[in-house]
Regions:
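Active-/binding-site microenvironments in catalytic and ligand-binding cores
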Residues: 1-208
Length: 208
């Protein structure tokens, strides 16, 4: 029997948690079938950093590539999920405990429960030294189950910059609470939005 794909994306709804001060997600039926005579037509507004999304380097570096300029092959392929639940900070020292040889995409499961409708007040933080460590291992994509790889109130974003400097791309707000550690196929394609600093993704995995 073929193994099933698992959706690890947050659902967009008008109640989804949003970064404080950012554009909240809103969907509405702008024109109903009764109005048009043939179809319903929906309309939505959102920040590109709401829900499960990919960061483009342009998000934190005005001279760096935007989302449509990134290689889509980064977001398709074999990935490894590791359980780092309980760590307040995650870097070289914490990840050295895992077998990561041959891994190219790494998804970090840090939370036992995620509520997409509540923006968190505290999250695990990735250390700046994780960028060099991932490059040494040949990993070019890191995914986390919270809104940022840096602290929520951090303005320097040193980990974002360190990851970019070492060729590591970022996925945020994955849903991994019900996913077991192991090897998976991953598809998490960003939309082709010209000039954008990020994009929502529909992230799915399938056990290898």
């Amino acid at each position: 029997m073929e193994k099933r794909w698992i959706d690890i994306s947050q659902s967009f709804s008008n109640k989804i948690g949003t970064w404080p001060g950012d554009t909240p997600f809103q969907f509405e039926v702008a024109f109903s079938k009764e109005q048009t005579g043939s179809v319903n037509i929906g309309r939505f507004t959102t920040s590109v950093h709401t829900g499960t999304h990919a960061d483009a380097p342009f998000h934190f570096d005005s001279d760096a590539p935007t989302i449509e300029q990134l290689d889509i092959n980064v977001y398709i392929g074999r990935a490894k999920v590791v359980d780092v639940t309980g760590f307040e900070t995650i870097g070289r020292e914490e990840l050295q405990a895992f077998e990561l040889d041959g891994v190219e995409r790494l998804l970090l499961k840090t939370a036992k429960h995620v509520c997409a409708e509540q923006f968190p007040t505290q999250i695990p933080v990735l250390k700046e030294n994780i960028g060099a460590f991932l490059k040494e291992k040949g990993i070019f994509l890191i995914g986390v189950d919270h809104p940022s790889v840096d602290a929520l109130d951090d303005k320097q974003l040193l980990t974002h910059h360190a990851l970019y400097q070492h060729g590591v791309h970022i996925l945020e707000n994955l849903l991994l609470q019900d996913v077991s550690p192991g090897d998976y196929e991953l598809i998490a394609l960003p939309l082709k939005i010209q000039g954008a600093d990020g994009s929502p993704v529909r992230a799915v995995i399938r056990a290898m």
